[in-house]
């Protein structure tokens, strides 16, 4: 298989384009400019709010004007990580992709399919005039990965749609009603420093080799957590 064989062709065409545009969280200026240029090229109404969220509107197919307006949403930032032996600047360098068996992968870095594939899907729909649809609004939010700040910054009236479909999911062909949710906790405590008694030793404790998983999609599986495991041993006294 080659990249040109990937289907749907329109989706992967735009995904490859997106991979050429650096888009770290909180540094989305280049991908915002790309989206604005896309909207202008296709003569679609495009606007950007104060946070950097982008909305591109596409009128309904003739005869579909009375359907409810649908909002398609994805986020334009990505998690930026690389292997230790890879030289890559996420602020300037494109993501290099390759086919590995049946998978499209990045060469030594994160791929950015979260949520680049959602962005590419929206762009493919906006660019394809053969798809019949009602009034359509495509929303591209910033800074999802480090706090959902783009989504939180949305103001009433920026969109007008009655239905919103978020395209940032894990499993193809499935629709979820609801979300995983999240909680932020701030814990504080006071402590008193004491001298280390004679005969005591310092130890460095590492917890590694765990299976890991997504805190939203895998939280219910009971897997080991490297933050919690060391704490569970603090009450023990070594012989």
Per-region residue spans from a language model:
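Conserved small/polar residues in nucleotide/adenosyl-binding loops
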Residues: 234-239
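Active-site metal-coordination/substrate-binding segment of hydrolases
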Residues: 64-146, 151-155, 161-162, 202
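Pocket-edge structural micro-motifs
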Residues: 58, 74, 99, 108, ...
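Acidic/His- and Gly-rich active-site-bordering loop/insert found
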Residues: 2-102
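Flexible, glycine/proline-enriched loop segments at strand-loop-helix junctions
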Residues: 21, 25, 105-114, 174-175, ...
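Conserved active-site and cofactor/substrate-binding residues in soluble primary-metabolism enzymes
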Residues: 6-13, 26, 30, 34, ...
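Fold-level recognition of mixed alpha/beta catalytic cores in primary-metabolism enzymes, strongest
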Residues: 137-213, 217-222, 226
């Amino acid at each position: 298989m080659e990249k040109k064989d990937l289907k749907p062709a329109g989706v992967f065409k735009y995904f490859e384009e997106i991979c050429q545009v650096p888009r770290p969280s909180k540094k989305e200026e280049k991908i915002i400019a790309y989206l604005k240029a896309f909207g202008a090229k296709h003569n679609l109404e495009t606007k950007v709010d104060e946070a950097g969220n982008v909305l591109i509107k596409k009128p309904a197919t003739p005869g579909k004007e009375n359907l409810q307006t649908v909002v398609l949403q994805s986020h334009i930032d990505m998690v930026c990580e690389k292997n230790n032996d890879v030289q890559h600047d996420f602020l300037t360098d494109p993501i290099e992709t390759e086919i590995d068996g049946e998978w499209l992968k990045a060469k030594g870095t994160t791929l950015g399919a979260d949520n680049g594939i959602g962005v590419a899907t929206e762009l493919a729909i906006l660019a394809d005039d053969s798809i019949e649809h009602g009034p359509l609004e495509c929303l591209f939010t910033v800074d999802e990965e480090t706090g959902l700040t783009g989504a939180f910054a949305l103001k009433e009236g920026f969109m007008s749609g009655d239905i919103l479909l978020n395209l940032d999911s894990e499993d193809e062909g499935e629709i979820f009603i609801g979300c995983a949710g999240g909680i932020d906790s701030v814990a504080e405590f006071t402590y008193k420093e004491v001298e280390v008694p004679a005969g005591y030793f310092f130890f460095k404790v590492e917890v590694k080799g765990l299976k890991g998983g997504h805190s939203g999609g895998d939280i219910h599986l009971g897997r080991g957590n490297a933050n919690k495991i060391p704490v569970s041993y603090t009450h023990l006294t070594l012989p």
